[in-house]
């Protein structure tokens, strides 16, 4: 294919990715909000399009599509654009919309937006000082300076999510961790909730009755006769006010208890549904996956520990290494190079699809959890920043899963980064995240029955 035809193919694919990002923005993130800033929508869609294009170019590297020079050009162009968006455009607009929400700074929002962006750039640049992420010969304006710093943030984010996911996935899927919940437990808790609601209604009726009596009494004594009449009205209303305050305090405490009882009741219903679901064929399948992921989690933690202790980074991609070990052990004739290419392609494809799907699901949940009509623009831009850094760092790590002959152009485009550092850093953060998640889930699982008994 000629360079022009290759470029047309890349532009068409980028337009498709842009359209998908636009639809995701409209139908998932902003479907419940009327006010939309089109610049936010464009920035999010552009970030999504160029992030997906990097994964597309990885697939093209393995399949050998497009000319080598075309792939190199589009790798370079794509990387420059995504870095420009992540380092300059998105941080500036985040500061701009933050300042726009502050009325006192509304007239000088451009000045304060630039100030926020310069502050971001200072800390972003200082981020590279403590890490051995660059070769000493790179200049201060080289593209490697930006990639290296974006990679540190992205790899840290990936490792945190991977560590928590490796622990939370088996905990969620396995029926072993489900506590036993009966209909009697649910009915008892619902009865307590109804009793609490009745007490709240009763006390609020008392408050309304006391206020009505105070209002009627106030009309009768609206014109107290003389000095002693005023003293009498003040002294008689003081105990009533104290009584009202005490009843209101009791109502507040009961409402807090009702919220806890409601959440606990909803949790028991969800657990009961999970128990029933675990008895179905699909539930048993996910239970099996839970055991598989448990083994995977233990293996990943073990290998991360080994890599950290012995300062070890694999030189061969995992697929080729695994096939070589199997072939040598069984002593059979096998074309390792041919099959490692195809299996690596399938593996990388699975990693790419699951990464994009998982990140989009996580972004949607996160957005609905913390967004509001005023903060939604800022939240979307933050998600675009996280998404772009996540995908750039994914390329740094996926590179190790590819056979050596497919890494050439990617390595040339990314520059002489210290790739081994990123893999070691991933192992360190993954280990910390996984162990912290195990401790957190253990405490939460242990506390749940105690909380249920207390309620």
UniProtKB/Swiss-Prot annotation:
Keywords: Glycoprotein, Golgi apparatus, Ion channel, Ion transport, Membrane, Protein transport, Transmembrane, Transmembrane helix, Transport, Voltage-gated channel. InterPro entries: ABA_GPCR_dom, Golgi_pH-regulator_cons_dom, GPHR/GTG. The keyword Ligase does not apply. Pfam families: ABA_GPCR, GPHR_N. It catalyses: iodide(out) = iodide(in); chloride(in) = chloride(out); bromide(in) = bromide(out); fluoride(in) = fluoride(out). It is found in: Golgi apparatus membrane. Homotrimer. Voltage-gated channel that enables the transfer of anions such as iodide, chloride, bromide and fluoride which may function in counter-ion conductance and participates in Golgi acidification. This is Golgi pH regulator. The gene is gpr89-b.
């Amino acid at each position: 294919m000629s360079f022009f035809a290759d470029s047309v193919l890349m532009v068409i694919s980028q337009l498709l990715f842009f359209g998908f990002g636009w639809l995701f923005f409209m139908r998932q993130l902003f479907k419940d909000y009327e006010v939309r800033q089109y610049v936010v929508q464009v920035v999010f869609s552009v970030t999504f399009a160029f992030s997906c294009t990097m994964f597309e170019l990885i697939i093209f590297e393995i399949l050998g599509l497009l000319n080598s020079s075309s792939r190199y050009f589009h790798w370079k162009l794509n990387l420059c654009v995504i870095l420009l968006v992540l380092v300059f455009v998105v941080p500036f607009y985040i500061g701009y919309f933050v300042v726009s929400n502050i009325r006192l700074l509304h007239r000088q929002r451009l000045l304060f937006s630039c100030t926020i962006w310069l502050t971001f750039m200072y800390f972003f640049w200082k981020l590279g000082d403590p890490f051995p992420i660059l070769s000493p010969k790179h200049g201060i304006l080289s593209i490697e300076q930006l990639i290296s710093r974006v990679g540190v943030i992205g790899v840290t984010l990936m490792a945190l999510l991977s560590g928590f996911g490796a622990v939370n996935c088996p905990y969620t899927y396995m029926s072993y961790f489900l506590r036993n919940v009966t209909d009697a437990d649910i009915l008892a808790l619902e009865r307590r909730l109804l009793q609490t609601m009745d007490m709240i209604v009763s006390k609020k009726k008392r408050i309304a009755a006391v206020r009505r009596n105070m209002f009627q009494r106030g009309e009768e004594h609206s014109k107290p006769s003389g000095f002693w009449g005023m003293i009498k009205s003040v002294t008689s209303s003081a105990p009533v006010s104290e009584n009202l305050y005490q009843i209101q305090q009791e109502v507040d405490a009961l409402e807090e208890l009702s919220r806890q009882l409601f959440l606990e009741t909803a949790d028991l219903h969800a657990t009961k549904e999970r128990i029933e679901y675990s008895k179905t064929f699909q539930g048993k399948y996910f239970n099996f996956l839970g055991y598989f992921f448990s083994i995977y989690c233990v293996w990943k933690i073990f290998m991360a520990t080994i890599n950290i202790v012995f300062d070890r980074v694999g030189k061969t991609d995992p697929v080729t290494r695994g096939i070589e070990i199997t072939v040598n052990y069984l002593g059979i004739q096998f074309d390792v190079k041919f099959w490692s290419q195809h299996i690596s392609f399938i593996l990388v494809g699975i990693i790419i699809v699951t990464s994009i799907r998982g990140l989009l699901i996580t972004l949607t949940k996160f957005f609905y959890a913390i967004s509001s009509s005023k903060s939604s623009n800022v939240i979307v831009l933050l998600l675009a920043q996280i998404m772009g850094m996540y995908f750039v760092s994914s390329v740094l790590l996926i590179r190790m899963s590819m056979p050596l002959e497919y890494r050439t152009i990617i390595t040339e485009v990314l520059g002489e980064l210290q790739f081994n550092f990123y893999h070691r850093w991933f192992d360190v953060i993954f280990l910390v995240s996984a162990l912290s998640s195990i401790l957190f889930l253990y405490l939460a699982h242990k506390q749940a029955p105690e909380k249920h008994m207390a309620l």
